[in-house]
A protein has these predicted regions:
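Conserved active-site/ligand-binding neighborhood in enzyme cores
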Residues: 1-431
Length: 431
């Protein structure tokens, strides 16, 4: 079985943080750097810290377990630290509580989930939705008050169990951070002087005193016997550069494991399952191949058939992975997607710095912008039985089966190892 080294890190910013999106910082466009950091930002920061701490001649490599020898020979670079996996960041209050994005089916703090699928029989006429998708509705009139953006673990657990959500477990963005605006002037990197007329504005995040970023990390796999990578990187409390301009955060190691920090899914009663995203997910468009039909991606998970909406997941590892792990392979789950509550997409971009010997190879520069489904998105599924519904929940829950405390499932097609596609399941009722 895999040898995993879980570690929980708390990052306390010592200054403003800047997390810009893919929009240019020129003309009338302000530098939108005041958004909460995406999962890949912290993962990249840890990777960069590992590269600085363990140079290329270091015996600590942690290459990707599935990187074959032929691929490494053909590549100009080594996939160092490929076993590093992260979940988060999430805001952590001064009292140590972790907070998570509000599910999209909540409208009012005083009520539970109110946005639900209609029964198909309620709409016997024509619908623009392809079968078997059903419209969503609410039995509560939307008010002017806005639901807080964050819920702590206790409030999220109450939501998953259909219980009353205590207001003490809810928080707005300004409970953790505020936006600051500033002006800057463009610099010439060759001369180190300013560029005349290149003035820009930007927005940044300043965290409240005592508030932190919480990140769950894992390193190691069944092929590696080394000591934990991050334990070597942070033998005691340390420092790390995060986001644009390399702003510094103090790093503290925490003892709590994922099962004590992340909300876990309850046992499923009935044949309906909803999957709530705790982090964004990326489902790219897929071209047709010999084995698969084309898939539009976007809001629709690539593991859902685009024509029938049938789920194409297994309740355990696939044949190849099961062979590597020495366990029994899973069996297909029979379920279909019937509705989804999806807010506006969020752009995911980045920048690749060249490694030694790669300058001028085209591997450096801006990465392609990806469009992600935001955290808080809710997907609604139906199955033929309660047993099948629980199997679906086991395939979608971040922890797999009930009672498990390990991070098992990352259901984003891209960047799952960086913390995308982390979700939790619960039963639901129709209107």
């Amino acid at each position: 079985m895999p040898t995993s080294h879980p570690l929980t890190l708390l990052l306390r910013p010592h200054d403003i943080l800047f997390f810009r999106d893919s929009r240019p910082m020129a003309g009338a466009s302000a530098g939108h750097g005041d958004r909460f950091p995406f999962p890949h930002v912290l993962n990249s920061a840890l990777h960069a810290a590992c590269h600085r701490a363990f140079p290329t001649d270091s015996p600590v490599a942690y290459t990707h377990a599935r990187a074959s020898a032929s691929k490494q020979r053909d590549s100009q670079r080594t996939e160092r630290f490929g076993s590093l996996r992260t979940v988060g960041p999430f805001p952590v209050a001064e009292d140590g509580r972790w907070f998570f994005p509000k599910p999209g089916d909540l409208l009012d703090p005083r009520s539970g989930p109110v946005i639900l699928p209609f029964e198909a029989s309620d709409f016997p006429g024509h619908s623009s939705l392809p079968e078997p998708l059903q419209p969503l509705g609410s039995h509560v009139q939307a008010g002017k008050s806005t639901f807080p953006q964050w819920m702590d673990r206790a409030a999220f657990t109450a939501y998953l169990h259909g219980q009353v959500i205590e207001s003490s477990g809810l928080a707005h963005n300004d409970s953790f951070f505020v936006t600051e605006e500033s002006l800057g002037i463009g610099m010439n990197p060759d001369t180190g002087t300013t560029n005349e007329g290149q003035i820009y504005s930007r927005r940044q995040l300043r965290f409240r005193e005592g508030c932190q970023l919480g990140v769950l990390t894992e390193t190691g796999n069944q092929h590696q016997k080394e000591e934990d990578l991050l334990e070597q990187l942070f033998p005691e409390d340390g420092w790390i550069r995060v986001g644009g301009e390399g702003r510094v955060c103090q790093v503290t190691k925490a003892s709590k494991q994922p099962s004590a920090l992340l909300p876990t899914g309850p046992a499923i009663r009935g044949n309906r399952v909803k999957w709530v995203l705790l982090s964004p997910a990326i489902f790219p468009q897929l071209a047709a191949s010999d084995k698969n039909r084309p898939h539009p991606g976007g809001w629709l998970p690539t593991w859902v058939d685009a024509e029938t909406m049938q789920v194409q997941l297994m309740d355990g590892p696939g044949p190849n992975k099961a062979r590597r792990l020495g366990v029994e392979p899973g069996s297909p789950v029979s379920a279909k997607l019937i509705a989804a509550r999806v807010e506006r997409y969020v752009p995911v971009a980045g920048w690749t710095n060249p490694s030694e010997g790669e300058t001028g190879t085209g591997k450096e520069g801006a990465r392609s912008t990806l469009l992600a489904v935001p955290a808080g998105t809710v997907y609604y599924f139906e199955t033929a039985s309660e047993e099948e519904a629980q199997r679906l929940a086991n395939a979608l829950n971040w922890h797999g089966q009930p009672g498990s405390g390990t991070i098992t499932n990352r259901r984003s097609t891209l960047l799952g190892e960086k913390g995308y596609g982390i979700g939790v399941c619960a039963p639901y009722e129709t209107l």
